[in-house]
Every structure is written in structure tokens, then in C-alpha cells.
Amino acid sequence: MAEAAVVAWVRGPGTVWKALPCASVGCSVRDVIYRHCQEQEVPVECFFVTCNGVLVNAGDKVQHGAVYSLEPRLRGGKGGFGSMLRALGAQIEKTTNREACRDLSGRRLRDVNHEKAMAEWVKQQAEREAEKEQRRLERLQRKLAEPAHCFTSPDYQRQCHEMAERLEDSVLKGMQAASSKMVSAEITETRKRPNKSKTDQETSAKKRKRKCFWLGMDGLEAAEGSSTGSSEDSSEDDSEDAPGTSEQSCCAREDGIDAVEVAADRPGSPRSSASGTHSESPEKLQCPVTEPGQGILENTGTEPGETSDKECNERKTVTDPEETPARKETESHEATEKDQKTGMSGGDRAAMVLSGEDRKSVPAANLEGNNSGDTALGLEAVDLSAFSSAAELESLGLERLKCELMVLGLKCGGTLQERAARLFSVRGLTKELIDPALFAKPSKGKKK
């Protein structure tokens, strides 16, 4: 009997199923697969053969009715992924947070847990609103409720009553003591204050009307008037405690008169006529004349209340009235000799005697005197019209150019060329036409 033909089923690549008959019973799997790959036009080396999920060797015989599958070969990687899996497994075992994991439906556990918490919060929303309203009502009731203050302390109340009684008694005693002191003070004043005689009133009126020619002592007249008025209103007891007040004003007047007379005796004094007229008044008091201008210095340095009684008495008793004119002439003669030696003019000496307001005008007068001082020192004024250029002015020298610039009130610093150019630029110009930037700045006083 003829042998039956062997038929094998081959699947692949893909989902292609095909029955391949074998020419002989001893046909191998390699022959069948080779013929199938030729028909499908795919390389044999890219597949391996499995039968019922088991890898089949290429030299085995073909079984009748068996299904052979062609599985594509996969290229292998570098490796090392296993170590990563082991590290991830160890980390998963150590942590307790499973929110990054997924459930069987593929959702993350974090999202699932958030949904559950949100549902619980929405359910409790009504309860929270009710609790909030309850707290608001309780707070409002506490504010509206009246304070239940119940403080009962008999000791405290007793102390309050005692303090009020003591305070009332103390106030009454103080008022009684004050009224008794006021009454006693009025009685003593009426006893100690006698009636003033008409002679005393006339004397005080004369003192009030008497005025002296003061030099820079305008404030002393006001002080004298206030002291005289206050002395009339004060009691005799107070006047006995300070007996030197009237004598101080007397000495101050006498010192001022003597100083005015000394200034009047000097030549060129601007106040000689006024002081001489005042010195001939019949109300002049005679006091000793010390050094010239000493009375003025003492009066300007001290107030009338600072002069002691002893100094006033010594001034009254040291010299006689007859010696005063002789000493005045001697001192005026000595002052004239000193002026001649020191070169001080009469106007300068009179400026020393002037008050603070008069002294302000003295520097301006001295400045005008300095403008003509070059002629007195033997230096003639430079005629700028005789020079045709600044280079010719340089022949005068630094010091001479400085002097000329100072006379004009201009800046005197700089080099020889700068000074000559500055002086030449103002040639033939009046003071109003000169550039203000060329004038020297006024010197500032020293800060104390």
C-alpha cells in the first residue's frame, strides 16, 4: 500500500496559515521552513520555529498535521535593566506612600484619595456653617450682656470714707493757715511802712528826671529808670537791705561824665562839644578820675547792680574837687603825647570811646585811610593810563601789584602775570563798571 503524504501547517510571518505537503516521510523541518520562506520572500535567518510553544530543532522530522509557527528573532539590548528593577523593588518595600501607585482600573491612588476627601468635606460644609453661626451668636450675646461685677469689701469702703474725711479736714486747715498768714503780713506791712515826706518825693522825682550823656549806655538809662521806680514802690526795709543801689547809679553817672570829659579834652574828638556842654551842668557830681576811658570800660563791662558799695565810697573820698581840673589837664597832655608817639589820630581815639553802634563805622573810615596810606609810606599811586599793556605792569613786582589791587578792593592773589592782567583790565574804569567777579570777598569773622 502506498505511503500517505505528510502535511504540515505553517503560521507566519504575521497571521498567514498555510498547509505545506511534504514529498517524503523523512522530510525535515528545515526543508519545510526554507520552502515557505522562499514563497513569502523573507530570510530564513530572521525566524526560529516553535511547535505548540516549544522550540523545535531544525533537523527534526516533520509531524503530520502539526502546526509550526515562525517567530521573528528580537535583537538583544545592552543589559543592566535588571539592576534598576531590583533598586525600584527595594524602594517600594521601604516606603509607605502608595499614592503614586495605580489601582486595577489604572487610576492613581492619589487622585482616588483626593476625591474621597473632597466628598467628605462637601458633606461637612453644612455642619461647619452651623457651627460658625453658633459661635457668632454666642460672641454677640457676650458683648450685649451686662457686666456682672459684684465687688463687696467693707475694709475698702471704710478706707475710702476715712480718706475723704481726712482730705476735707486738711483743706480746711490749710485755708485757715493761709488766711491767718495773709492777715499777719498786712499788719506788719502797715507797721513798717511810714509815710513818705514831701522832700523824699521831690528827691525821687529829681532822680527820675536826671539824665546823663551816656556813650553806648542806652540800656543803663532804662535800667536806672526801672530801678528808681521799683525803689519808690518797695518798703524801707528792703531799701535798708540794699543800701548801695542809689550810690551805684551815682557812681555810674560820674564815671560816664569823667570819660566824656577826657574824650572832649583830646584834639579832633567828634563829641567834644556835646560832652563839654554837659560837663558844665550844675547837677554834675564830683568823683575821682582814674586812667583815661576807665569809667567807660567799667560801665560797659558791668551793670549798675554789680558795683560794690566799697568802690563807690572810695571814689567819693579819695580826691577832692579842687584836684580834678589839674589832673584832667595832666592826663589830656599825656594822652596827646601818646598819640604823637603811636601815630594815632584824634578821630581814631574818639572812635575807641564810641559805643558799639559808632564802632561799626570805624573800620570803613580806616579802610579809606588805608587807601591813601601808600602815599604816607612813600609809595605813589600808580597811573594805569601810563601803561599800554599788562606786560609793562609786571615791572612793578608782586608786592606793588598786590598793594594796588588791595587799594581798589580787587583780588590780590595769583602769579605776577595774573595780577598784572587783573590790574590792567580795570584801567580807566569806575567802580560800578568793574566786573563784580574781580572784587575780593569780605572776610568772615572768626567763629567762637
From Swiss-Prot:
The modification Phosphothreonine is found at residues 277, 324. Residues 393-427 form the SAP domain. The keyword Cell division applies. Its main location: nucleus. Keywords: Cell cycle, Cell division, Coiled coil, Cytoplasm, DNA replication, DNA-binding, Mitosis, mRNA processing, mRNA splicing, Nucleus, Phosphoprotein, Ribosome biogenesis, RNA-binding, Ubl conjugation. The record marks 77-78 as: Cleavage. The modification Phosphoserine is found at residues 269, 281, 332. A motif (PIP-box) lies at residues 39-52. One of its GO terms (biological process) is endonucleolytic cleavage of tricistronic rRNA transcript (SSU-rRNA, 5.8S rRNA, LSU-rRNA). It comes from the Eukaryota. Residues 188-205, 307-341 have a biased composition (Basic and acidic residues). GO terms for molecular function: damaged DNA binding; snoRNA binding. Residues 109-149 form a coiled coil. Residues 175-252, 264-372 are annotated as: Disordered. Inhibits translesion DNA synthesis by preventing monoubiquitination of PCNA, this is necessary to counteract damage due to ultraviolet light-induced replication stress. SDE2 is cleaved following PCNA binding, and its complete degradation is necessary to allow S-phase progression following DNA damage. The PIP-box (PCNA interacting peptide) motif mediates both the interaction with PCNA and cleavage of the SDE2 precursor by a deubiquitinating enzyme. This is Splicing regulator SDE2. It comes from Mus musculus. The gene is Sde2.
